[in-house]
Amino acid sequence: SRPMKAVVTGGAGFLGAKIVERLLERGDEVVVFSRKPNNLPAGASAHVGDLRNQDDVSDAIKGADAVFHVAAKAGVWGPRDEFFGINLTGTRNVVAACHQHGVRDLIYTSTPSVVFDRGGIDGGDESLPYPKKFLTHYAESKALAENEVLAADGVSGLRAVSLRPHLIWGHGDPHLLPRVLERARRGKLKQVGDGRNRVDITHVNDAADAHLLALEYIDRAAGNA
């Protein structure tokens, strides 16, 4: 496929940087939209801005063929305004900029938290509904944002798709495994249940590859999570 211009929000983060790396390997031009131009993958250009500022987002996305919207505020604790400002308003700004500038493809990084309702999920798939009541500001803001992304599919020629990777780990992981290992070393790692509980985790390479495949097959995947 011909080289394209891609914008990656959160492209200096753990998953975002791996997506940027994959795009650069393909020969694409890559712009990283981030609050700070730190840890910029070599070969990418930086556009510093705030997702909550429509002008910042619009300026970054202008001229892009594809946008990977990876940036988000994650976590269980924190002010509602912060989660909704970054995750929902920020996503609305990304969608508006895609429509404004005629972007062809939008790949959104969501989370399985959008369908979690306290009960265990065994063999769950894309047909799971959003819960009646969300357990965290994070889950609610991401679900509402995902909904906006999927509703934008087909508007002004935009093709949009959402992915829900869970607990991303791998080389350079700044959060998940380091915390687990640190708690284990301190004897603070708690077992929940009888020890047979399972949790799905996603290697960062697989998560990045999934984003590139979503772009490659977006004519089939568009409008879906």
Please place each PLM-identified region on the residue numbering:
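N-terminal Rossmann NAD(P)H-binding glycine-rich loop of SDR-like oxidoreductase domains
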Residues: 6-26
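Conserved Rossmann-fold NAD(P)-dependent oxidoreductase catalytic core, especially the SDR/UDP-sugar
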Residues: 89-138
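NAD(P)H-binding glycine-rich loop region in Rossmannoid oxidoreductase-like domains
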Residues: 38-39, 48-89, 97, 115-117
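Alpha-helical substrate-binding/gating segment
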Residues: 181-190, 199-225
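Active-site Tyr-X1-5-Lys
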Residues: 133-161
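Glycine-rich "substrate-gating" loop/helix at the edge of Rossmann-like oxidoreductase active sites
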Residues: 134-136, 166-174, 194-205
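Glycine/proline-rich active-site loop of Rossmann-fold NAD(P)-dependent oxidoreductases
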Residues: 143, 156-158, 169-179, 213-225
